[in-house]
Amino acid sequence: MTKVILSGCSGKMGKMISQSVNNFEGLSIVAGIDKFKDESLKYPIFENITECDVNADVVLDFSRPDALDSLLSYSKDNNLPVVLCTTGYSKEQLDKIDEYSKIVPVFHSANMSIGINLINNILKDISAMLYENYDIEIIEKHHNQKVDAPSGTALLLGNTIKDSIKEDTVFNKGRNGIKKREKNEIGIHAIRGGSIVGEHEVIFAGAGEIIELKHTALSREVFAMGALKACEYMAGKNNGLYTMDDVIKSKN
């Protein structure tokens, strides 16, 4: 049985993970980390991970970027793999994740959905081929409580496109004003409203036709299931930086 410490256990995603873990025979949540103690959860909850004295095999985080330092330190001190599902990290924090992956097993993905990661792989294959004759725009939609924009997933998709194209490209985040669209732009637009779980659309707009890749999450369960699959995968892994691609490939 792989024992999981869940950081952010009292949030919406934390609660969904606590429900979804019942679908995994080989996983159990043995402790939670959150400043809000939800009495409905059936495991001990600590306000800070430094207080946690429960034996575990993996740390799973769905909290906030400012928890990163304590999570990485705990993972290092206890020699535990850490699964980072939080978005909104700064460049400095992303660099720290890379640095720590040399001494502990670290999983990091901007989106835990299998579908999004398959679209990301498709973009690696088609972006360079389409760039010359198509304008590229990304639209992402989320609920009105999401604090980071553009979403980590939109940036993931955008960076995949940028990395696939030999020419220098730039992000135009939220086009505004009176200005002609430049050829080397990749537009990224964020919409916030209601209870939208998550929707991402990549548009290749050419002369006379439009190619669209779109993913819609209908429930947070899709992210919870992906995160728990990542926990299964990371148990016992060697030091290194892992992504959802590694999880997908392991199932083939």
UniProtKB/Swiss-Prot annotation:
<comment type="pathway">
    <text>Amino-acid biosynthesis; L-lysine biosynthesis via DAP pathway; (S)-tetrahydrodipicolinate from L-aspartate: step 4/4.</text>
</comment>
<dbReference type="GO" id="GO:0009089">
    <property type="term" value="P:lysine biosynthetic process via diaminopimelate"/>
</dbReference>
<keyword id="KW-0963">Cytoplasm</keyword>
<keyword id="KW-0521">NADP</keyword>
<dbReference type="InterPro" id="IPR023940">
    <property type="entry name" value="DHDPR_bac"/>
</dbReference>
<dbReference type="GO" id="GO:0016726">
    <property type="term" value="F:oxidoreductase activity, acting on CH or CH2 groups, NAD or NADP as acceptor"/>
</dbReference>
<protein>
    <recommendedName>
        <fullName>4-hydroxy-tetrahydrodipicolinate reductase</fullName>
        <ecNumber>1.17.1.8</ecNumber>
    </recommendedName>
</protein>
<dbReference type="GO" id="GO:0008839">
    <property type="term" value="F:4-hydroxy-tetrahydrodipicolinate reductase"/>
</dbReference>
<dbReference type="GO" id="GO:0019877">
    <property type="term" value="P:diaminopimelate biosynthetic process"/>
</dbReference>
<dbReference type="GO" id="GO:0050661">
    <property type="term" value="F:NADP binding"/>
</dbReference>
<keyword id="KW-0560">Oxidoreductase</keyword>
<dbReference type="Pfam" id="PF05173">
    <property type="entry name" value="DapB_C"/>
</dbReference>
<dbReference type="InterPro" id="IPR000846">
    <property type="entry name" value="DapB_N"/>
</dbReference>
<feature type="binding site">
    <location>
        <position position="143"/>
    </location>
    <ligand>
        <name>(S)-2,3,4,5-tetrahydrodipicolinate</name>
    </ligand>
</feature>
<dbReference type="InterPro" id="IPR036291">
    <property type="entry name" value="NAD(P)-bd_dom_sf"/>
</dbReference>
<feature type="binding site">
    <location>
        <begin position="152"/>
        <end position="153"/>
    </location>
    <ligand>
        <name>(S)-2,3,4,5-tetrahydrodipicolinate</name>
    </ligand>
</feature>
<feature type="active site" description="Proton donor">
    <location>
        <position position="146"/>
    </location>
</feature>
<feature type="active site" description="Proton donor/acceptor">
    <location>
        <position position="142"/>
    </location>
</feature>
<keyword id="KW-0457">Lysine biosynthesis</keyword>
<keyword id="KW-0028">Amino-acid biosynthesis</keyword>
<feature type="binding site">
    <location>
        <begin position="109"/>
        <end position="112"/>
    </location>
    <ligand>
        <name>NAD(+)</name>
    </ligand>
</feature>
<feature type="binding site">
    <location>
        <begin position="85"/>
        <end position="87"/>
    </location>
    <ligand>
        <name>NAD(+)</name>
    </ligand>
</feature>
<dbReference type="InterPro" id="IPR022663">
    <property type="entry name" value="DapB_C"/>
</dbReference>
<keyword id="KW-0520">NAD</keyword>
<comment type="similarity">
    <text>Belongs to the DapB family.</text>
</comment>
<dbReference type="GO" id="GO:0051287">
    <property type="term" value="F:NAD binding"/>
</dbReference>
<comment type="function">
    <text>Catalyzes the conversion of 4-hydroxy-tetrahydrodipicolinate (HTPA) to tetrahydrodipicolinate.</text>
</comment>
<dbReference type="InterPro" id="IPR022664">
    <property type="entry name" value="DapB_N_CS"/>
</dbReference>
<dbReference type="GO" id="GO:0005829">
    <property type="term" value="C:cytosol"/>
</dbReference>
<keyword id="KW-0220">Diaminopimelate biosynthesis</keyword>
<feature type="binding site">
    <location>
        <begin position="8"/>
        <end position="13"/>
    </location>
    <ligand>
        <name>NAD(+)</name>
    </ligand>
</feature>
<dbReference type="Pfam" id="PF01113">
    <property type="entry name" value="DapB_N"/>
</dbReference>
